[in-house]
Structures are given as C-alpha cells and as structure tokens.
Regions:
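Canonical tetratricopeptide repeat
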Residues: 49, 83, 90, 117, ...
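Helix-start (N-cap) detector for alpha-helical repeat units in TPR-like alpha-solenoids
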Residues: 43-45, 78-79, 112-113, 145-147, ...
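Terminal, low-structured helical/coil segments at or just beyond the last alpha-helical repeat
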Residues: 317-359
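Structural signature of tandem alpha-helical TPR/SEL1-like repeats
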Residues: 57-66, 91-103, 125-137, 159-171, ...
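Structural marker of alpha-solenoid helical repeat scaffolds
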Residues: 73, 107, 141-142, 175, ...
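Alpha-helical segment of the N-proximal tetratricopeptide repeat
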Residues: 42-73, 86, 90, 120, ...
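Bacterial signal peptide processing site
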Residues: 38-40
Length: 359
C-alpha cells in the first residue's frame, strides 16, 4: 500500500548515523579477525577497508569498485558482499543489493546483519513477506534495538498489519524516545488512520530533533494540506525537495499542492517526473487525473483515476473524483456506483455526493 505520506526507512549502514552500534563492533571485529587470520588474503582486506572509507564518504560507486576487488581476491568474503550491498542500495540499485545480501548469506547463513539489511531490500523491492521472514530470523539478537523495531513496523505497514506496526513503533520509541525515524513513521501511521492530532505531535517532535528530516517535512506539508493550508504546506514540501530533489512522492505532493493553488502549468511537469521515477504510485496517477480534470479533459482524467484504482483503491477521495467524471460524462449509474464505493471507504465527499445525486 503506497501513500502520499512517506515512511522514512532506517538503514544499517556504515557510519552514517543509522546503524546500531552493535553492528559497528561486528564489522570492526570481523575486519581485525580477517586481517589476523590469513596473510594470504591481505590484499582483499585492504580493498575491503578502502571500500569502507568510500562508503563513509558516500562515494558509492567507488565503494562498490573496491568491494568488488575484494571479492575478486576472496570470493567467499561475506562482509564484502554485505557492504557492497549497502553501497548498491544507497546508489539506488535495490535488486543488486538484494543479490549481494543473499550471496553473503549463502556464504555465512548466520550473518545476522545481512539478514537485517536484506529485510530492507526485500521491503523496497515489493516483498514484505520476505522482509518479515528475515526480521523474524534475527529477532532474538535485535529485538531490543530501536532500529530493528522501526524496520519491523515498516514491514507490518506494508503487510497492512497496522496494530502490529503501531506496537513496533511504540517499542522503538520506548527504547529510544528521540528516534526520529520512529516518530516520523508512527506519525505517518497515525495519519493513515485519520488520527491527525497524534500524527502532528509525532511529526513536529521529529522536526524538533532533526529539522532536515525530509520525510517529516513532507508529512507535515500533507497535514497542513489536509486542513486546506496549501500555501504553508507548499513551503514544507519544497524544503523536503531541497534535501531530496528526485524523490517521486515529494514531486507528486508539490504538484498536488500547485493544483490546489491554481498553478496547473507548474504542476504538470512535476507529476510527469514523479511518474517517470515511480509509475506505480497511485497517488501520482490521481494527481495527473486532477490535472486533466482541471483542463476539462474527462477521458484522460478518468483513465488516470482508473489506473490509480487498480494500483491502490484506498487513495483518498479517489471514488469521489471518479464519480464526478462519470457524472460529467452522463454516466449517472456509474457515478453512483463509484460514490457508493467511496462511502464504504468513509470518503466524506463521496458520501455527500451520493446523498445528493443518488438517493
């Protein structure tokens, strides 16, 4: 289930601020052990260490190159596969990261960190069930990690097990009450359940702790938009885009706000770019439908709304807009059917239109 509201993912990475301290100790221990255990593999170890330096510097292509050299020298180097997976993930190569984590686990089936990292890659490649399986595999070792609980919550959200997600985020914050990712993601969960006050409390707390948390900026923008404060909302999503200029959800959300502010010519290229980056985002298809609706091109609008429906029928107000287009095309029965489906989803606008037009 995708959303206009963004869940911020926590990653176990190399010295970037998100990785649990225990993993840092593991990596350093593994490196020292590796260096001490075999002079024959010293060259591979040197490439591995160079890769770690580049990973810390966020030079992901260079890190990948060094890790690949290490693997060439020592094909069963599980740590190098794991860290190359991290670098690939950071470089937006999800499938490549998944393959590297799996290879690390083929070499060392007890490599808990690789299970944790693969859980994220599986989640990001559309396999929340596989993600949960990996997380359960390392539950004993990581259950008292706030980062583990955030990942578990994110996975439960994708599996639409929302009460379990709530429990995981709550546990993450019990373990570390200033965990910005946990606050951001629990706030997103509250928003999805229309619990707007606790959503705002979590999001504002996250931004107090980290004013540059792009997901929290985006989510606060949408809370303000929900109240109709579109101009103020625009300033926050623009801040999010300054931090992540290519993020497709942020691009779409800015386009949506520009439509609400009657600036369609500015909105159109943004929603197009959003869909180029993620064609499976139902919210972006709805935004494009709203653009065409404003241009009085009902057929194009309906096409986009129907695509959104196939991708995620839970998109807010989707059936209200489908009904409006069908009514404009003279299809009263289809309009009433759409509004009835919106009523089942507790869409206030659909409920109102059905009462006015169909009952």
């Amino acid at each position: 289930m995708k959303s206009r509201f963004l869940i911020r993912n926590t990653k176990i990475t190399n010295s970037t601020g998100y990785r649990p301290v225990a993993w840092l100790f593991f990596m350093l221990y593994a490196t020292v052990c590796f260096l001490a255990c075999s002079n024959a593999t010293d060259e591979a170890a040197q490439f591995f260490l160079k890769g770690n330096v580049q990973l810390q510097k966020r030079e992901y292509k260079e890190a990948i190159r060094y890790y690949s050299e290490a693997i060439t020298k020592k094909p069963d180097f599980a740590d190098a596969y794991n860290n190359r997976g991290l670098a690939k993930f950071r470089n937006d190569d999800r499938e490549g990261a998944l393959a590297d984590y799996t290879r690390a686990l083929d070499i060392d089936p007890d490599f808990n960190t690789a299970y944790f990292n693969r859980a994220e890659a599986r989640l990001e490649t559309g396999d929340p069930g596989g993600s949960l399986s990996d997380l359960q595999r390392v539950e004993k070792q990581y259950r008292d990690s706030t980062f583990y609980q955030v990942r578990l919550g994110d996975t439960y959200v994708r599996l639409t097990k929302l009460s379990d997600a709530q429990s995981a985020y709550d546990r993450a914050l019990q373990l570390k009450n200033d965990n910005v990712e946990a606050l951001t993601n629990r706030g997103a969960l509250y928003y999805s359940q229309k619990a707007y006050q606790p959503a705002e409390a979590d999001i504002r707390r996250a931004l107090q702790l980290n004013p540059k948390q792009d997901a929290a900026l985006n989510n606060l923008s949408l809370l303000l938009a929900h109240r109709g404060n579109y101009a103020d909302a625009l300033t926050y999503v623009e801040q999010a885009l300054e931090l992540q200029p290519r993020q497709p959800y942020y691009l779409n959300n800015k386009a949506y706000l520009l439509l609400k502010l009657n600036r369609p010519s500015e909105a159109f290229p943004l929603v197009q770019e959003s869909l180029q980056r993620d064609s499976q985002n139902a919210w972006a298809h709805q935004t494009l439908g709203l653009y065409w609706l404003g241009q009085k091109q009902s057929d194009k609008a309906l096409t986009e709304f129907r695509i959104a429906e196939k991708l995620d029928a839970s998109v807010d107000q989707l059936y209200y807009y489908i009904g409006m287009v069908e009514m404009a095309k003279g299809n009263r029965a289809r309009a009433c059917e759409a509004w009835q489906r919106g009523e089942l989803a507790n869409d206030d606008l659909a409920i109102k239109q059905r009462a006015l037009q169909c009952l």
